[in-house]
Amino acid sequence: MADVDESDLKILEILRKNARTPYTSIAKELKISEAAVRKRIEKLIKMGVIKRFTIDYELENEIRAIVMVKTNPQIPTPEISKKIIKIQGVEFVYETTGDYDILTVVRGTNISSINKTIDDIRSLQGVLSTNSTIVLRVWF
């Protein structure tokens, strides 16, 4: 991140909170031109700092769970992570340190759909065990 300066970090923070923030609003807050904001964002995309623009959403009656995954050390964790992210219902996959190698966030419309997603994760070669917890509230 050597080419990322303080203004870039401020832009990233603004976009993290609301990816739809108009460039004019960002420019006004940072006291720079709209063209400068546009160039900086293009640079951040080209550098791979900004991976994608997305939305956070919450549907009524939707359930989220955190699923921690312990993996077989003989199978590279990234191989397993790449398979997990393709499973229906998996929203995020994080490789972590500690007792578990992977932490995932899964979404479903009911407990059965969450359970199916967890079963799909457990069925992958290299997954030794999982530990799941239901999310009660999400704060943005």
Swiss-Prot record:
Residues 23-42 bind DNA. Residues 4-67 form the HTH asnC-type domain. It comes from the Archaea. Pathway: Amino-acid biosynthesis; L-lysine biosynthesis via AAA pathway [regulation]. Disulfide bonds: none annotated. CDD domains: HTH_ARSR (cd00090). One of its GO terms (cellular component) is cytoplasm. GO terms for molecular function: sequence-specific DNA binding. GO terms for biological process: lysine biosynthetic process via aminoadipic acid. Gene3D superfamilies: 3.30.70.920, Winged helix-like DNA-binding domain superfamily/Winged helix DNA-binding domain. Keywords: Activator, Cytoplasm, DNA-binding, Transcription, Transcription regulation. In the absence or at low concentrations of lysine, activates the biosynthesis of this amino acid via the alpha-aminoadipate (AAA) pathway. Homotetramer. This is HTH-type transcriptional regulator LysM. The gene is lysM.
